[in-house]
Amino acid sequence: MAQRVQEEDEQMTSTDDLIQAEIELYHHCFAFIKSTALRAATDLCISDAIHRNGGAATLSDLALNIGLHPTKLSHLRRLMRVPTVSGVFAVEDHNGEAMYTLTRVSRLLLNGDGERTHALSHLVRVLVNPLTVASHFSIHEWFTIEQAAAMTPFEVAHGCTRWEIIANDAKDGSVFNTAMVEDSRVAMDIILKESCGVFQGISSLVDVGGGHGAAAAAIATAFPNIKCTVLDLPHIVAEAPTTHSNIQFVGGDFFEFIPAADVVLLKYILHAWQDDDCVKILRRCKEAILARDAGGKVIIIEVVVGIGPKEIVPKEMQILFDVFMMYVDGIEREEHEWKKIFLEAGFSDYKITPVLGARSIIEVYP
């Protein structure tokens, strides 16, 4: 053992290697600062401040727009270096002063009036959330403590489930539901532009776990002939806006019953459940839809790990998303894992279309 340690030390005799190794270690340790700086910029409404200032703003402009005390100006400069280095915002020299502008990423942080199609500021607040982050600091306990075996990392950290907090904390629940609406709008805008054929020939659709109906509204607007039903828990559909005449909201439990329709949509639902529960949900879906020769299918929108763009960012996003979902004992699946639960639920075939970058459309046929 001692000899092996000595050999490993000798492999790092180069000063350059040691320096590079230390830099990489620090870089990994400080990676969370990217997320917290992004969250801070989102909560400070930096994107909106730049937008209100004509699309470009100095530090002084930002401070004035967001009502920042002058003593915090130098700290704002330090904070803004993080999202500019990582490409969330752009910066250039303007007469010796830093001038910040929006990028395609920071435009997604614009709040607008709540109706902006491409807005994800609330999603950032859900993903980079102190409750969620604390859960990941409990993962080691979840792995090693026997009494934690039947709990999620979130329960280990907080003594209750994530869903209980969403249901009982009005503010947290509102942010979460708004985030799901935002994400649905962006996803459906892409799908309806790039892969609208998945909805062709459908006369009725049930969006299972469809929240406030953002996905259903997009489908009903693009395909007025499709009668859409949104199924979600009673307290969620009770708060849903009734803005579209072609959408019906039904309160219920998708483990117990799913209304009959040509097609069932499951968008970002199954990744929150383990395989046995996914099989139960899919069997309920199979009971609700038409036969395959009559156009019946289940449309799933989820990550398929290993399928999609080969660039490092989307590949890494899939892996990070998978570990992120551990906090509620969820999982992002590879194709063979999806296939296993489809067959166990009684489906005969499926088709994967990687149209959403790191996420895909999966059409599953009875």
UniProtKB/Swiss-Prot annotation:
**Positions of the catalytic residues:** H271 (proton acceptor), E302, E332
Q: Which InterPro entries does the record associate with it? A: COMT-like, O_MeTrfase_dom, Plant_O-MeTrfase_dimerisation, SAM-dependent_MTases_sf, WH-like_DNA-bd_sf, WH_DNA-bd_sf
* Cellular compartments per GO CC: cytoplasm
Keyword set, alphabetical order: Cytoplasm, Melatonin biosynthesis, Methyltransferase, S-adenosyl-L-methionine, Transferase
Q: Where does S-adenosyl-L-homocysteine bind?
A: G209, D232, D253, K267
Please state the protein's primary subcellular location: cytoplasm
Give the protein's function.
Methyltransferase which catalyzes the transfer of a methyl group onto N-acetylserotonin, producing melatonin (N-acetyl-5-methoxytryptamine).
Q: Which species is this UniProt entry from?
A: Oryza sativa subsp. japonica (Rice)
GO terms classed as biological process: biosynthetic process; melatonin biosynthetic process; methylation
Q: Which reaction does it catalyse?
A: N-acetylserotonin + S-adenosyl-L-methionine = melatonin + S-adenosyl-L-homocysteine + H(+)
What protein name applies here? Acetylserotonin O-methyltransferase 3
How is the quaternary structure described? Homodimer.
Q: Where in the cell is it found?
A: Cytoplasm
Similarity field: Belongs to the class I-like SAM-binding methyltransferase superfamily. Cation-independent O-methyltransferase family.
* Tissue specificity as recorded in UniProt: Expressed at low levels in roots, shoots, leaves, stems and flowers.
Name the pathway it acts in: Aromatic compound metabolism; melatonin biosynthesis; melatonin from serotonin: step 1/2
Which EC numbers characterise this protein's activity in its record? 2.1.1.4
